[in-house]
Amino acid sequence: MPDVTRRVAIKRILSASVLAVPFSGVSGCGKSPAEDEVSAPEREEMAAVATAFMRKFDVPGLSVAIARNGRVVYENPFGESNRESAERLTVSNLFRIASVTKPITATSIFALIERGKLGQHDKVFGDGGVLGTRFGTVPYEKWVEEITIDQLLTHTCGGWDNSNDDPMFENPGMGHAQLITWTLDTKALKNPPGMHYAYSNFGYCVLGRVIEQISGRPYRDFAQEEILGRCGVRDMRIAGNTLEERLPEEVIYYGQNGENPYDMNVTRMDSHGGWLAAPRDLVLFLNHVDGFKSTPNILKPDTIKAMTTPGPVNSSYARGWAVNNAPNWWHNGSFPGTTTIMVRTASGFCWAALANTRKPGQPDIGLALDNMVWDMVRKVSAWHA
């Protein structure tokens, strides 16, 4: 997907939840507090906002989950998971989440840091690095051996950005090891590490291999067992690449303007863009890393603070999370057939919204998806959003 729409992805990330409403999510037990209840007229107004978004961007299926103070207070699927068969979307349908994966990978890294198995400023490549000389040809190109874990987390490794030659969208037949070796050998860094922000999918691919090296487990297993499972998430999976590899609960993706959702190696994107999820899954995850006391967090407060503190070069991006002064934390995702966002806000809300299409160009569907959920939340007067 090396097109101009990917180059604006980070603009979406940095501006998307400047508008975001407050949410935090996990399903609670017992009766919801009265202020959490959504009336029938309010639900109708929320649905009107969602369907207007769908009409504007020709969205087949849209699914939204919202939580407040540790309790899921709203879930609604709109439209179809499969246009051809007119199969209605359900709350359990799984979507590719694209770069909404990155907070999950960052949380996995910080879990290892918290356990003393990894250092935030450890070197990644070369003698003494976490990955040593496992990938690439020694001697490495200039600056490669200076890259640290933190620089990968903050997109300041010095190159390999998501421009027209993003390594993650080249050589689709290569596995992780081949692709990392090829990239180290053929794509020189553009800047010294730590000096320049450039959004890097490849950097998060490398972080997935760091997790595997330290934990001794495949990335997906570590994330499922040590992160998602501890949040009560059971159904998230790494996506396949083709329509034939579609899982039973997975939606069908629809490209627009000539985009093909099924010609990418999404499985290889595991740690930067490869997960499948339903909105509730993401809300459950958010609720357990949001730093609030309404639900137990899976990381210590100091660890969460380190993960969500703005980076040294770009004050709008922390470590796997876009951030602002509210402080709200969020991430969005975008590739052919997929538009996604999840948000944690300072006032105790979390949300996730997932769509099974992407419409390139302007107006920006990613920003519109963010605005849509804000508008939906503001329809509930008791939430004071």
Each language-model region and where it sits:
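Short, glycine/proline-biased beta-turn/loop segments that scaffold the active-site neighborhood
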Residues: 119-139, 230
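Bacterial lipoprotein signal-peptidase II cleavage site
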Residues: 30-35
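Short, surface-exposed loop or secondary-structure junction motifs
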Residues: 71, 78, 82, 137-334, ...
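Active-site SXXK
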Residues: 64, 70, 93-124, 207-212, ...
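Short, gly/Ser/Thr-rich active-site loops of penicillin-recognizing serine hydrolases
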Residues: 308, 360-385
